[in-house]
Amino acid sequence: MNTALTRFRPLIPAGGVGSRLWPLSRAHAPKFLLDLTSSGNSLLRDTYDRLIDLSNGSVMVVTGTSHANAVTQQIPELRAADLVLEPSPKDSAAAIGLACAIIHRREPDAIIGSFAADHVISPVDEFQRVVTEAVITAATGKIVTIGITPTEPSSAFGYIHASESLGIEGAPNTHAVDTFVEKPDTTTAQKYLNSGEYTWNAGMFVAPAALMLKHLEANEPELYAGIMEIANAWDTPEREAVMERVWETLPKTAIDYAVAEPAAAAGDVAMVPGSFSWDDVGDFDAVARLNSEKSGEQLTILGEKDNVINHGCSGIVVANTERKISIIGLDDIVVVDTPDALLVAPRSKAQAVKDAVGEVKARGLNNLL
């Protein structure tokens, strides 16, 4: 094993509801706890399994207190010391920053890696090779992001513009990062795709914990002070009291704003291209595509397959009740049947599910969220 890997401590921020996957994904059963690819595992479990072999048996999960039981049921071997529970959502900088601070307090020379709980990645061995290259690069004193080669001019992701190769032994594909670009419009995204100089920012990064905290202190001093106070009490009897007093005072901000973008401007960020298949499973169109690619079938059925009567339809049906669902002669449909809500839409409008959720909120139907 490369010596840098002995310092590697991955963490998984497991948050967010996934509103474009409503009514299947809810606050009490969010996207990352679901099996959306018919693998037999949740997205969280698959993420954990990809990382555990690289980590000397220690992967930290950061999630909301309401998901603690579900997380430990899905990952029964997760150590209590590796489960960080947030009393309320505070965005990615607080979640990742606190995990980073706890790891750094325990192991000052640790290299952390942050990987979202709800992505689909294959093949696993290629992902692990890329992460190893990122860890080797991070050991030289860099924050390393993993850039995904764009397959379309998407306006749903941020972009990374890289420059010269850094020539790091053991990490031949590493490049310096010039800038992070916010989610562009479709025309600009097409220009990025045509240039071949940009990769998608998938929110995966590897870095020395000390370097992450250095940039967090410089750019978000109030947030830094709060998470350090919590981290210093974490492995003591004072944890709950300090968490209760400090957590709600922390400012909300994303890790890209708090660390990645200013670190790139300071020349501290590198990029390793992700030469693997990646999908953030952002809507039901993605769920249908991923399952169809695996099964070769035109209609994906999640849930109770015997409850679906299909006559020449394609798309996706989620059958989460005992009700029988009969569909006839419809192409590229989305049907999601749950005990208290039913969604019907064409796959082409899968992104608009978020608008439907907005209407549910506006009507005060919080029990459906």
List where the protein language model places each region:
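Left-handed beta-helix
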Residues: 2-7, 209-211, 215-369
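Residue-level signal for inorganic ion chemistry
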Residues: 44, 99, 118, 160, ...
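Conserved core of the sugar-phosphate nucleotidyltransferase
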Residues: 124-246, 268, 346-347
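Conserved beta-strand scaffold positions in the cores of enzyme catalytic domains, especially
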Residues: 33, 83, 143-145, 268-271
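Conserved N-terminal catalytic core of the sugar/cofactor nucleotidyltransferase
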Residues: 1-13, 19-27, 32, 37-126, ...
